[in-house]
Amino acid sequence: MGAMVAEPVGCSHLDQIHDVTPSAEGCEDCLRIGAWWVHLRLCRVCGHMGCCDQSPNRHATKHFHASGHPIVQSAEQGEDWYWCYLDEVAFELAG
């Protein structure tokens, strides 16, 4: 995983971050197939709620590969970090 930084250094896709409504309260794909997940990631382009790479099905990453949407945000309580798949960098937004 890339370095965690206070400013989005190295991410050139900030213009794709939008205010979105989560598509589900859990991983929408796991809910559909009756699977489980470890942590949730919210696509900040379209609102797709997917599971993390530690989850068996890695639906957030699969969504990125299918859609090309590069930015996810942790949907875990108390976490406010983002990940850019294209630039492979984790970051938090200031302010």
Where do the PLM segments sit?
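Cys/His-rich, Zn2+-coordinating zinc-finger modules
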Residues: 7-17, 21-26, 33, 49-95
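Canonical RING-type zinc finger of E3 ubiquitin-protein ligases
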Residues: 35-44
